[in-house]
Amino acid sequence: MTTDIRALYTRLPAIDRLLRDPAFSPLLAQHGHSQVVAQLRQMLDEAREQISQRQTLPDWSHDWLHACEQRLTAGQRSALRPVFNLTGTVLHTNLGRAIQAESAVEAVASAMRAPVTLEYDLDDAGRGHRDRAIADLLCQITGAEDACIVNNNAAAVLLMLAATASGREVVVSRGELVEIGGAFRIPDVMRQAGCQLHEVGTTNRTHAKDYRQAVNDNTALLMKVHTSNYSIEGFTKAVDEAELAAIGRELDIPVVADLGSGSLVDLSQYGLPKEPMPQEMIAAGVSLVSFSGDKLLGGPQAGIIVGKRALIARLQSHPLKRALRADKMTLAALEATLRLYQHPEVLTERLPTLRLLTRPAEEIRRLAERLLPDLAAHYADFAVSVAACQSQIGSGSLPVDRLPSAALTFTPHDGRGSRLEALAARWRALPCPVIGRIDDGRLWLDLRCLEDETRFMEMLLR
C-alpha cells in the first residue's frame, strides 16, 4: 500500500467520533441511532471501495453529516410518489390510472381512522355483507339484480368463470381472445379457472351459427370479451350482446361479458368515443358483466360484476371470493365514486377522470401559452414551444381514439438527443417528478392532465 493511499484511509472518520459530534444530534433524533449507524457504515464501505479502486475519496466525504442526512431522507421517501403525468396518457397504468375524486379520498381517510361497518349490520347487530351497500348502488345505476366486488377485473373474470363453468366448456369467438398488459390472456384465465376454452369463428368474422353449432351438453357459458385495447377493421362480423343473449335464453345457457374498462355513462354526450356500458349489457339480457373500477369509471382499482341474482350468489359463495375480496379502503372509495354518478349534471366537475378527458383543447393550449415565456427563458439551451398533440385515454380503453391537446416541447439547440435524456432524468429526480415523453427529437409535456400549474412551475424553475 502506498503512502498516499494509506493517507486517504486515515482521513476516514470513526463512526463513534461522528456520533459524538453535536451536529449529528438532530439526525439521530429524527432517524434513530440504528439507521444513522447503518447509513454511516455503508458510506464508509463505499469510501474504502473508492480508495481501493480509484485512489480518491468520494465527493461527499468533506461533509459526512450532509451526505448522511441526504441519504436517510431519500431512503424515507415513499415509493409511491405523486408525479405530474404529462405523458399524454390520461389513465396511465404505470402511474396508477384514475385520480380519485375528493369525496373518494375523504371516504378512504375516514375508513382508515376508525372502525367501520364493513361487515356489521346496525339494524340487527348481526354480521352484514361487505359488498351490500355498493351492490345496491350498482343495481340502481346498471339495472342489474345484484353485484359482486373483487380487487380487479382480472380477478372478476377468474371468479366469474371458476364459479359458473369449472370443468366445463366456455364458448368464445376467436376474435375476442384478448391479451392485456402483464400477459393476462383470456385462455390462460380459463385454464386457471378450470374451464375448457371452445373457440368459434375466425379472427375477423364470427356468426351466430358458430355459437349455436358449438353448444353441447358440456357447455357452461357463452362469453363476450370486449376488445378494448385493439380494433379489428375491414371485412369483419361479430355477434352483438343482444343476439348472443337471445341465443343463450333459447338454449338455456348463461351469457357473460368481460367489458374490461367499462363506462357507466355514455361518453359520446361529452364528445368522446362511445364505449360499451354495463347497463346496456344488462338490458340486452347478458347474465353477468364484469368491468374495472379504476379505468373509465374513475374510481379505485376494483373488479365489478353485475348481473343475475342467482349467479351472483354462486360467486359470493365460491372460495375464491374471499381470496379476491376488496378491502375497506377500496370499498369506501368505490362507494363515494359511484355516488357521484347519481348526479350526472356535475360529473365532469367532480370526477377527475371525466374532467381530464373532456378538457377542451383550446383551454389546454391557452395554459401552454401562459407558461411558455418563463420556461423558455429558464431553459436557454432548448427551443421551447407550444405544439398541438394527441392525448390517449390509456389502460386499454378506446385504443385507436385520440383527444386533441397541446404540449410544451423542448428541443436542444445543439440537436443532441443525450440532452433530452438528461433533461428527462433531471425532471424525474425532482421532489415532485415531471414525467413527459421523448418523440421526434423533442421532449413533450402534454398539459391535458396538468391542473396544479403553480406547483408545476415551482418544479421546473428550480
From Swiss-Prot:
GO process terms (BP): conversion of seryl-tRNAsec to selenocys-tRNAsec; selenocysteine incorporation
Protein name: L-seryl-tRNA(Sec) selenium transferase
Pathway: Aminoacyl-tRNA biosynthesis; selenocysteinyl-tRNA(Sec) biosynthesis; selenocysteinyl-tRNA(Sec) from L-seryl-tRNA(Sec) (bacterial route): step 1/1
Name of one Pfam family that matches: SelA
A GO CC term attached to the entry: cytoplasm
Top-rank lineage group of the source organism: Bacteria
Subcellular location: Cytoplasm
UniProt family annotation: Belongs to the SelA family.
